[in-house]
């Protein structure tokens, strides 16, 4: 392998990845780094140097595998574009030639044999995605495009081991880490601050799971919001779930629990949630509002759409009226459509009602 060529390409790619570094007062590109103590930051820099050169061994690190894993995780949180480094390491002690006991970590890499070629392919592939985003679009629209693109283009495979962006962009397969790193990377290439979030999912009863989960938060107009691109995956008919797009800590906390190694910014608002932006949120259930919601959804080719409510009581009112009393069919007619079959699901955790139709006729 031509290591000189690899180093040059990787170095240029690192500049591409970090193009917005230090481009704002909060330095979001190095957010995780800034949460570390001085010794951890030293190891972070050693890991960075090693990754740029694909060097497997880093010496004189922190004591213990967990302490070093915290730093490696922070490095990967700041640098989603380094798809060739894996999120695992091996810690060990060794005796140097002077008889001193020292420690080290071993890093693991993928795609080493053709890394220069893979990096160039990756940069070219990602640049094509950005052709679909207009420079004059606001950040909410740009994040919508990213969320929608990942939800429709990538399949989730819980058995897939690659947690990087490589599998997402080149193989169309990923897990939550790959989805989130891809979202973060694409957002940052648009100049939008975006951070990784680590934690756990809640089940339908609100119990915290035992398997780790990863999602993101992004900044719009000086306010941070949470996003879970994995939970937005499109169904068999291509309908994307935007319930976890641009959410507050309170709303996302109904289904997610943050367990980060370092503090994250607060996400205080749902003002830019998909439901509020598309006027599908109701403090009090009002069936007259459902008609324009149907018209708006169908105009966007969304045959599955979600109504969101202030609390579980209003959700139950909507479910009773629309589905138990079957008023949903008359509302579709008022909106100008005839449907014969309506599927639905309720989520009492986030007070939402999902309505889906497979076929319709215009009246």
PLM feature segments, named:
Residues 1-27, 146, 176-178, 182, ...:
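Gram-positive cell-envelope targeting signals
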Residues 21-124, 298-299, 313-321, 326-363:
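Linear, non-domain "peripheral" regions
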Residues 44, 69-72, 119-126, 130, ...:
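Extracytoplasmic/secreted envelope proteins and their assembly/folding machinery
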Residues 109, 113-168:
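Secondary-structure boundary elements
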Residues 109-111, 200, 231, 309-311:
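A mature extracytoplasmic/lumenal domain signature
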Residues 113, 161, 170, 174, ...:
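Conserved active-site-adjacent core of cysteine acyl-enzyme catalytic domains
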Residues 178-251:
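Hydrophobic/aromatic-rich core segments of domains that either
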Residues 242-363:
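Low-complexity, Gly/Ser/Thr/Pro-rich intrinsically disordered linker/tail segments
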């Amino acid at each position: 392998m031509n290591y000189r060529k690899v180093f040059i390409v990787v170095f240029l790619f690192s500049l591409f990845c970090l193009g917005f570094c230090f481009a704002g007062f909060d330095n979001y590109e190095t957010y995780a780094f800034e949460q570390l103590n001085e010794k951890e930051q030293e190891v972070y820099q050693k890991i960075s140097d090693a990754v740029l050169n694909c060097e497997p061994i880093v010496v004189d690190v922190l004591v213990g595998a967990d302490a070093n894993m915290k730093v490696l995780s922070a490095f990967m949180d700041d640098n989603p574009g380094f798809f060739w480094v894996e999120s695992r390491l091996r810690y060990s002690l060794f005796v140097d030639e002077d008889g001193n006991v020292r420690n080290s970590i071993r890093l693991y890499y993928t795609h080493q044999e053709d890394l220069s070629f893979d990096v160039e392919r990756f940069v070219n592939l990602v640049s094509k995605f950005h052709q679909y985003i207009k420079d004059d679009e606001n950040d909410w629209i740009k994040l919508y495009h990213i969320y929608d693109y990942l939800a429709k283009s990538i399949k989730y495979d819980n058995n897939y081991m690659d947690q990087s962006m490589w599998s997402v962009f080149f193989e169309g397969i990923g897990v939550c880490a790959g989805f989130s790193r891809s979202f973060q990377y694409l957002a940052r290439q648009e100049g939008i601050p975006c951070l990784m979030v680590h934690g756990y999912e809640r089940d339908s009863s609100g119990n915290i799971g035992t398997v780790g989960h990863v999602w993101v938060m992004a900044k719009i107009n000086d306010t941070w919001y949470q996003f879970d691109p994995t939970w937005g995956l499109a169904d068999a008919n291509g309908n994307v779930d935007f319930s976890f797009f641009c959410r507050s800590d309170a709303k996302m906390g109904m289904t997610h629990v943050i367990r980060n190694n370092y503090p994250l910014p607060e996400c205080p608002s749902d003002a830019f949630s998909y439901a509020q932006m598309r006027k599908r949120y109701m403090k009090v259930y009002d069936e007259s509002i459902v008609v324009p919601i149907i018209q708006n959804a169908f105009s966007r080719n969304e045959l599955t759409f979600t109504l969101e409510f202030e609390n579980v009581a209003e959700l139950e009112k909507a479910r009773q009226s629309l589905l138990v009393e079957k008023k949903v069919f008359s509302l579709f007619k008022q909106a100008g459509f005839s449907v014969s079959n309506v599927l639905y699901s309720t989520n009492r955790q986030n007070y939402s009602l999902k309505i889906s139709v497979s076929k319709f006729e215009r009246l």
